[in-house]
């Protein structure tokens, strides 16, 4: 089995790790960073930029730079979360034909899995460059509180990126795996994961290589992006009060505010006050305007007080579901960049009554855990058993529009559960199975995962037919449902792809597009490499021609000059083969010149033996030095 990589596909940043020599290794990208911004930009030339390259040009290209796409993955357009995103995003979020939230960039629509796939391709390439071989198998992490639609969409993203997703693993569980791999003692831990866009809390029991999740809870729309937005709004409001100009109408200015807000928030984790300076942020009739203000840590905490308050509820629920009091938790592990904020750490200490453990790198620990899980699946890591849970209850709609639960939240997965139902009216020929996920009593208040029909039920009075509904959740937390008429043996089943989601045809089309983009990227890289090689050769040839041109005949010199000119002309075009041919032609033409350079070097080198002979006395002096050193060693020994 080939190498299995572990990818933390984050809202703000992504990270990739692998097991090597029995140890997890985080792989640095081509820019030398161990994390990669989860950003994708589309340049005017049609070129796609990913990661740091996309982030660097975001200010000048805000409408075509996509970030925090994870917050849209597996979501319907007509939801409060998406409406909130639309109000603050510089890029265009649109409604797809299936009702999902997609993005529109330069007139082309992209699904969130498609955009996430571009980031995953970057992580795949990072791993391949490091390993020197093709990688296809991967473990990808998701927030523990992701529902089935979001998990399926993440798996689709992996497929579009050309990855065989062996397992979808919950982020807090991955972090626990990284933390507890070498721990021998039994302990109960809480993993507090506050990242760029999501918040998870999981309670686990660790012991003898068994990692058992007891409960999980969270909020898939609470993270660093929301904290940044509070700072952005404050800066914009203060500037409007001061200058009478609302910067929210200027997308370029807004992108600068976003970067400044994120920077200020990070700086306030280690200092009590920071300066925000944005020269030439805008202009009016009186001239250019500069933005200069101070933000204190106390002010930041006041701005984000409501968000900090939201952290407590899920923690209390998770503890209650696990049947534990805060004092029974041995360690609280902090995961996600936002846990560096002192106010978050203070809130964690208040909830659990103990100082959190800061022994893991919050940016890398999830990818490390995914890498370890990859090692487990490959058989490289022995004696590790991961028992995860489903974060939300699963059930179907029954008479009176009530949700009847078949599998309760925090049930260990994989699992399978069946229940027998009947018809609601006489001679009912078919039943519609409305599959739901959530904790509310009424069906309409929960998330619809899908609908399917069991038909051909023989005429019978209500309550007589026996319809067995079976829920099956796999190790990825993805749901399969079947319904069987026990009287006739007739069965109907579906793998839930949600009432929205991507069809197989759409995924296949996106896979083909991703492959063609990868081929385009390869061609671009080949062109750049060919140009670089040609440029180096042309420069060195011209330099040698100036120095040694008088050592060769005029005809040879003319041939070389013509070959250099032909190569420079070829470099102006995009034909890789033409550049390579012109490069070869120049190499051939400059053979005589190379001989002249070599001959001169040999002549200069000919003086060296004489110099060495003259230096005999120096050599003897050198020997004396060695003797002296030797004498000193002797003295030391004495």
From Swiss-Prot:
Keywords, A to Z? ATP-binding, Chaperone, Nucleotide-binding, Phosphoprotein, Stress response
Supply the CDD domains for this chain. ASKHA_NBD_HSP70_DnaK-like
Where are the residues of the annotated region Disordered? 600-638
Keyword Secreted on entry: no
Q: What Pfam families has UniProt attached to this entry? A: HSP70 (PF00012)
InterPro entries per the UniProt record, alphabetical: ATPase_NBD (IPR043129), Chaperone_DnaK (IPR012725), Heat_shock_70_CS (IPR018181), HSP70_C_sf (IPR029048), HSP70_peptide-bd_sf (IPR029047), Hsp_70_fam (IPR013126)
Which of the residues bear the PTM Phosphothreonine?
198
Q: Name the residue ranges with Acidic residues bias.
A: 628-638
Q: What induces it?
A: By stress conditions e.g. heat shock.
The cross-references to Gene3D superfamilies, in alphabetical order and at most eight, read: 1.20.1270.10, 3.30.420.40, Actin, Chain A, domain 4 (3.90.640.10), Substrate Binding Domain Of DNAk, Chain A, domain 1 (2.60.34.10)
Coiled coil (UniProt feature): none
Function, in words? Acts as a chaperone.
Give the record's family classification.
Answer: Belongs to the heat shock protein 70 family.
Looking up PANTHER family in the UniProt record yields: HEAT SHOCK PROTEIN 70KDA (PTHR19375)
Give the protein's recorded name.
Answer: Chaperone protein DnaK
């Amino acid at each position: 089995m080939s190498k299995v990589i572990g990818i933390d596909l984050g809202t703000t940043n992504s990270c990739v790790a692998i097991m090597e020599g029995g140890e997890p290794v985080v792989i640095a990208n081509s820019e030398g960073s161990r994390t990669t911004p989860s950003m994708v930009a589309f340049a005017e030339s049609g070129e796609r930029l990913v990661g740091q390259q996309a982030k660097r040009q975001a200010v000048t290209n805000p409408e075509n730079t996509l970030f925090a796409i994870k917050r849209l993955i597996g979501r319907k357009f007509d939801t409060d979360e998406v409406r909130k995103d639309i109000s603050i995003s510089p890029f265009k979020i649109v409604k797809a034909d299936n009702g999902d939230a997609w993005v529109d960039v330069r007139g082309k629509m992209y699904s969130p899995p498609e955009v996430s796939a571009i980031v995953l391709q970057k992580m795949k390439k990072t791993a391949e460059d490091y390993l020197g071989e093709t990688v296809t198998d991967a473990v990808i992490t998701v927030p523990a509180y992701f529902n089935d639609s979001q998990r399926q969409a993440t798996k689709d993203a992996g497929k579009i990126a050309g990855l065989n997703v062996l397992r979808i693993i919950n982020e807090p569980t991955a972090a626990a795996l990284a933390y507890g791999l070498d721990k021998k003692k039994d302990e109960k831990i809480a993993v507090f994961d506050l990242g760029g866009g999501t918040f998870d809390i999981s309670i686990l029991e660790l012991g003898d290589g068994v990692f058992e999740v007891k409960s999980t809870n969270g909020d898939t729309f609470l993270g660093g992006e929301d904290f940044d937005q509070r700072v952005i709004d404050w800066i914009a409001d203060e500037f409007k009060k001061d200058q009478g100009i609302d910067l929210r109408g200027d997308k370029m200015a807004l992108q600068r505010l976003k970067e400044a807000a994120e920077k200020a928030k990070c700086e306030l984790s280690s200092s009590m006050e920071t300066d925000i300076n944005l020269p030439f942020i805008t202009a009016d009739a009186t001239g250019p305007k500069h933005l200069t203000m101070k933000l204190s840590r106390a002010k930041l905490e006041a701005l984000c007080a409501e968000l900090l308050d939201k952290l407590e509820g899920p923690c209390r629920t998770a503890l209650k579901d696990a049947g534990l009091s805060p004092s029974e938790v041995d360690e609280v592990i902090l995961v996600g960049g936002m846990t560096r904020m002192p106010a978050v750490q203070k809130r964690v200490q208040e909830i659990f009554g103990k100082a959190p453990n800061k022994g893991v790198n919050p940016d890398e620990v999830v990818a490390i855990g995914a890498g370890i899980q990859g090692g487990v699946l490959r058989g490289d890591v022995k004696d590790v058993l991961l028992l995860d849970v489903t974060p939300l209850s699963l059930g179907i709609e029954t008479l009176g529009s009530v949700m009847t639960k078949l599998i309760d939240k925090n049930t260990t997965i994989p699992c399978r559960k069946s229940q027998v139902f009947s018809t609601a009216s006489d001679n009912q020929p078919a039943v519609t199975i409305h599959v739901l996920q959530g904790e509310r009593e009424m069906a309409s208040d929960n998330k619809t995962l899908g609908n399917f029909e069991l038909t051909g039920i023989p005429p019978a009075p209500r309550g007589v037919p026996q319809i067995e509904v079976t829920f099956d959740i796999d190790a990825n937390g993805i749901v399969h449902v079947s319904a069987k008429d026990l009287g006739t043996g007739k069965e109907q089943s579906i793998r839930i792809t949600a009432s929205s989601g991507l069809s197989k045809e759409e995924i296949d089309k996106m896979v083909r597009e991703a492959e063609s983009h990868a081929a385009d990227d390869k061609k671009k890289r080949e062109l750049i490499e060919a140009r670089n090689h040609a440029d180096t050769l042309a420069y060195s040839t011209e330099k040698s021609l100036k120095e040694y041109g008088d050592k060769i005949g005029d005809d040879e010199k003319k041939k070389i000059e013509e070959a250099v000119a032909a190569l420079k002309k070829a470099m102006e075009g995009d034909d890789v083969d033409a550049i390579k041919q012109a490069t070869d032609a120049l190499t051939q033409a400059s053979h005589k010149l190379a001989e002249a350079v070599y001959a001169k070097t040999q002549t200069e080198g000919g003086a060296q033996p004489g110099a060495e002979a003259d230096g005999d006395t120096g050599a003897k002096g050198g020997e004396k030095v060695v003797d002296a050193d030797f004498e000193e060693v002797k003295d030391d020994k004495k």
